[in-house]
Amino acid sequence: MAKEVLYSSTRGAQGNIKASEAILRGLAPDGGLYVPDHIPHLEKTLREIAQLDYQGTAYEVMRLLLTDYTEEELKYCISHAYDSKFDTKEIAPISEADGAFYLELYHGATIAFKDMALSILPYLMTTAAKKNNAKNEIVILTATSGDTGKAALAGFADVPGTRIIVFYPKHGVSPIQEQQMVTQKGDNTCVIGIEGNFDDAQTGVKKLFTDEKLAKEMDEKGFQFSSANSINIGRLVPQIVYYVYSYAKLLKEGRIADGDPINVVVPTGNFGNILAAYYAKNMGVPIGKLICASNSNKVLFDFFKTGEYDRNREFVLTASPSMDILISSNLERLIYHISGDNAAADAEYMGKLSKDGKYEITDDMRSKLVDFFGGYASEQETFDTIRRIFEKTGYLMDTHTAVASAVYSKYTEETGDKTPTVIASTASPFKFTRSVMNALGKGDDSKGDFELADELSEVSKVKIPEAVSSIRTAEIRHKKVVDKTEMEGAVKEFLGL
């Protein structure tokens, strides 16, 4: 029987609560993020896990962390999440190219890695509501840099007892990402563009979450907020699964021997995906280095190099927009863990970040980051990587994966480390068609993104994913754009408050 795991806020104002309560709440009342009181070790060996499919692996990982869900509840959630919505039975296949293993996390309904967690979150959430006798309708409030929004909308559309509101930076997502969101069906969905960047959207959402007056108004009308962003532990736990799965799969295929270390490279924005790899390592997966790959918004690269987190810098719009982030929310969980689970210290750092835009960690905390390596890739390096690997191997990747691939090349040059390496491939190249075509030297500004998708399909011999072809002529249903100061009004209008 797995030992119970309870969750508390990184900022410490809240006592321990069960997993289902943490998932329901999303963000702690003090603005902190929920973290487990201990990280359990895998109970089955990796050899045993290697005999399981993706769904079986998911159960083995999730039952250890979501301990108040019954076996029946978890298996129900897992079987409904990882089904024919994915275009491959493997759910997360691995491709080898140019000496690295690409863990493809984009085979779900919206062709981005967010599907891996957001296809199960609605089931975890509605199960949690039943378990906790929640009387209110759950309002999912989400900020997106492009991918989370669509994946959350697809997951929650027409789910009884829920509504979903997504804010995105009007001028900070790719045309295909925007088209995916604004054509979303479902009577319970609301998509709003904001005049501002992703950090503005995320800060606005966090503010709404912690607004006590608004919470009271909502409660009176039978609503309560929760989150589909990676601040929700229900997003993070399912992401641990694919790191366990990838190791077990490489083991099963004889590409590594039992116990061999692997390195993991993750293109990083909000720090959730790489934090899941850190948790997988702490659960017993032999991961050596956790290589954190940034684009030109290299606040995390600087943090790993100097120990200072400083968001006081220019926000750069890049060809990897899901990583255009200067306030990396999930880093707070890592700060909490490396401070020795010290909530007071974490709250102090986050206070400094809010007030001064920066903080510096202690030498002792820095010594606990030895397993992390921070790297970054410029736009040119990103584009060169897409082209070089495609011309050399025929393997096509999107801009975010290319950032990771470029950083991996730099890492091996710098260190000579030959450890087998898994690179998280986080989106289909068809989500960022224009940038990928530009990288291949076949860009054409006179053509639309869908026309370029046809050409990319021809060049790469890869079929256009259903997620792109189905939105070509879809009706635009969401046209609202507001200033970043008007987010509360927009929420109230949608909920009829």
For every predicted segment, state its role:
Residues 1-497:
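PLP-dependent amino-acid enzyme catalytic core
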